[in-house]
Swiss-Prot record:
One of its GO terms (biological process) is response to wounding. Belongs to the protein kinase superfamily. CAMK Ser/Thr protein kinase family. SNF1 subfamily. ATP binds at residues 25-33, 48. Residues 160-189 are annotated as: Activation loop. GO terms for molecular function: ATP binding; protein serine kinase activity; protein serine/threonine kinase activity. InterPro entries: Kinase-like_dom_sf, NAF/FISL_domain, NAF_dom, Prot_kinase_dom, Protein_kinase_ATP_BS, Ser/Thr_kinase_AS. It comes from Arabidopsis thaliana. This is CBL-interacting serine/threonine-protein kinase 9. GO terms for cellular component: cytoplasm; nucleus. The activation loop within the kinase domain is the target of phosphorylation/activation by upstream protein kinases. The PPI motif mediates the interaction with the ABI (abscisic acid-insensitive) phosphatases. Its main location: cytoplasm. Residues 343-372 are annotated as: PPI. Residues 312-336 form the NAF domain. It catalyses: L-seryl-[protein] + ATP = O-phospho-L-seryl-[protein] + ADP + H(+); L-threonyl-[protein] + ATP = O-phospho-L-threonyl-[protein] + ADP + H(+).
Length: 447
């Protein structure tokens, strides 16, 4: 390998239990999510990795163990399934169903607000999930669009049930600092921090989500946090004129600042607007064959229950074989067009040298207001200004696919997804000289 390039094939892969872990799918301040493949069954999964020391230090063991055990027993079509739980000396691994249809938020960012019937359909699926988990004694406490993902068939699934308490608990400033950095979806009683009913608080968050789906913007959105808190606590908002009377009635009953008089899920299920086109979920809830022994083992201090993390060299294959054999790195995804909407991550190809690509990215990012830190063939960019969800931060890495072909991967590591969309549009415009236009190359070959 020359000094100016990195190979696309990693030096090693981490293997935990039966799972070989791949690239990072998402990253937060308390957990990282990685793509994984079960080497025995071939099944794909997502693995959420928690810091074991943080869990024990913040005395979250019993609550997490109880809620994860309950969630492992839940097999609902609108809830991301927990498959198994493992632990090493330093990490807790929660193996989750891989849902690869993208966030519901991305659909809004791409299309704008949804039509009322489509918004209602997603809202019905959200309420199905929340109602079922509440019936099992598990509350989400941090519902927002980032927790709502779509499967390949467009079915809504809710993620992070049973884990949100930990995400807030480990922050120094407590409840107000939710995973997205703002309290826009949080109920007034949660903001007041006087103790609250988890069911009523989740219903409020569902109401904010419904408003966003139908309006395309938040009902409560102020740059000044104190002003925002006051508006939320007084439920100061107005519905846009395109909302139907039925939708307005439901949203106003949900966004009721008093949790005692707020509409319950039982009442919501009887509402005429909600019932339009409603199809109750059909599924088997047979948990006789499901064991939670792995959850107990993961949170125990027994060394016998720990899995080992192994670094293994991958099977030797050329880069195009690697790309073609994995749905995560399909050629269709690899050579995506510039105009296509990006989500939390994207990649492009270039026939320029790695050093030239690095220089061009640095040169393009700085005028956009980003601080740039380089490390070999990785770049970390952080915005100077704080947006709706803190400073936007982006990680990039250059890989060599062939001597004259590189892949550049960009991933949002912090900040707002919509701001990342805007950043990528400007960033890719500045990089047009180094991005390989595969359509043009194909035309040249035909001639």
């Amino acid at each position: 390998m020359s000094g100016s390039r990195r190979k696309a094939t990693p030096a090693s892969r981490t293997r935990v239990g039966n799972y070989e872990m791949g690239r990072t799918l998402g990253e937060g301040s308390f957990a990282k999510v990685k793509y994984a493949k079960n080497t025995v069954t071939g099944d794909q999964a997502a693995i959420k990795i928690l810091d074991r020391e943080k869990v024990f230090r913040h005395k979250m063991v019993e609550q997490l163990k109880r809620e994860i055990s309950t969630m492992k027993l839940i097999k609902h079509p609108n809830v991301v399934e927990i498959i198994e739980v493992m632990a090493s000396k330093t990490k807790i691994y929660i193996v989750l169903e891989l849902v690869n249809g993208g966030e519901l938020f991305d659909k809004i960012a791409q299309q704008g607000r949804l039509k009322e019937d489509e918004a209602r359909r997603y809202f019905q699926q959200l309420i199905n999930a929340v109602d079922y988990c509440h019936s099992r004694g598990v509350y989400h406490r941090d519902l927002k669009p980032e927790n709502l993902i779509l499967d390949a068939n467009g079915v809504l699934k809710v993620s992070d049930f049973g884990l949100s308490a930990f995400s807030r608990q480990v922050r120094e400033d407590g409840l107000l600092h939710t995973a997205c950095g703002t309290p826009n979806y949080v109920a007034p009683e949660v903001l007041s921090d006087k103790g609250y009913d988890g069911a009523a608080a989740d219903v409020w968050s569902c109401g904010v989500i419904l408003f966003v789906l139908m309006a395309g913007y938040l009902p409560f959105d102020e740059p000044n946090l104190m002003t925002l808190y006051k508006r939320i606590c007084k439920a100061e908002f107005s519905c846009p004129p395109w909302f139907s009377q039925g939708a307005k009635r439901v949203i106003k009953r949900i966004l009721e600042p008093n949790p005692i008089t707020r509409i319950s899920i039982a009442e919501l299920l009887e509402d005429e607007w909600f019932k339009k086109g409603y199809k109750p979920p059909s599924f088997d809830q047979d948990d006789e064959d499901i064991t939670i022994d792995d959850v107990d083992a993961a949170f125990s201090n027994s060394k016998e229950c720990l899995v080992t993390e192994k670094k293994e060299k991958p099977v030797s294959m050329n880069a195009f074989e690697l790309i073609s054999s994995s749905s995560e790195f399909s050629l269709e995804n690899l050579f995506e067009k510039q105009a296509q909407l990006v989500k939390k991550e994207t990649r492009f190809t270039s026939q320029r040298s790695a050093s030239e690509i690095m220089s061009k990215m640095e040169e393009t990012a700085k005028p956009l207001g980003f601080n740039v830190r380089k490390d070999n063939y990785k770049i970390k960019m952080k915005g100077d200004k704080s947006g709706r969800k803190g400073q936007l931060s982006v990680a990039t890495e250059v890989f060599e696919v062939a001597p004259s072909l590189h892949v550049v991967e960009l991933r949002k590591t912090g900040g707002d997804t919509l701001e990342f969309h805007k950043f990528y549009k400007n960033f890719s415009s500045g990089l047009k000289d180094v991005v390989w236009n595969t359509d043009a190359a194909a035309e040249e070959q035909k001639q």
